[in-house]
Amino acid sequence: MRRRRSAKATGKKKKPQKKTAAKKNKKARKKRRSFFEWLFSGTTRRSGRRFDSLRLFGRDVRLSFWPVFLVVIVLLLAIVVLLQGNSISVDEQQVTMVGLPEDLEGYRILLLSDLNGRRFGDEQATILREIGTLDYDAVFIAGDMVGSGGDPQPFYELLEGLPSSKPVYFIAGDSDPQPVLDVTRDITGTVEQMVLADWILGAIERGATYVDAPVELNVGDSSIWISPADMLNLDAGELANTCEEQMLQEQEGTVLGLQSDHDTLPSTTYRYERAQRLLNAVNSMTAADVHISLAHEPPSDDFLYASSTHNSSEEKYLTQPSLVLAGHYCGGVWRLPLVGAFYIPSSTAERHGWFPAQEDVQGLSTAGGTQLYITAGLSTTDSAPLMFFRFLNRPQISIIELTATLPQSMLEQ
């Protein structure tokens, strides 16, 4: 038998020992890649084929298909959001009212809502340009024009750009600063000047009417009553008596030198004057008058149904409104193809607002026997803070045209 010769005897170098399994695994372990390494890795996971090359910073960079595809999709979506977010849409809606006075046939209302302190161009040029192309008789504003930011200037710019010949009526929304001060101003002036917030007084100075109680708008020989929706189911007489009693007590306390009564008297007087204006409206409205109620958040069916059950002969409550105008939902903010809005910020909706019926999101519907129109508004809502931009949902202004003519769909039945 032949003996094996040692490495020394043969003069050959000894082969290095094989690496241990642990070292092999460590070497074979895949290096974690950053996002940019993944994006510019140059190969696809399946085939390893190169997709394309790009000269970037003086070097040839290889691009992978799927990462680039995803980036392109994100950029396209961002462009869509940017373009649609600054493009105003107009929704024109006819509202049929049986027995509408002839003076009000074809009367057109421009409805705005939910600006939330946003600007559309310098001094609201984009909105005002679109409004300038429309034919309308009055402007109704359904709240949240200032928003939680508290800056009224964008709202003021819009008011200043509207024609002075068109009457403007507005209410506050849930995201707006409080319309009434907690601590009244210690000044000599009207009750409103002592108790109303600066942004409300600023809007009034620019020609708008604050609808904190029913207001009568005369059109020819006919009347439109504009009311805040939160007064629909109030007993006007009882409210006026309660406020008057409290006001008289505080007046007496003020004379006696009670500081607490002196401090609260302006607010109580303001509430009493509101109650008196409500009572006057209840006593003045006739069956021939049109009653339009302004709400920020759309009222529930039960609330509107209750307003239809009051006996007008009792002269306690406002008559059932012919139409309620509202905003707040902002068209659902995010809308999906074939689905529409999948969420609205509503405490009274089914499923807490998730997957609502689309007729409850925007447009004309009937709630509690009353016609209700919801505009999609101009911006977003603080009630859905994660939806801080609109998606597939252009900002909207609405034109409401009153008519006594039945719609074609009803005539064909």
Language-model-detected regions and their locations in the chain:
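A short C-terminal boundary segment appended to hydrolase-like catalytic domains
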Residues: E37-S41, G48-D60, F65, A376-Q413
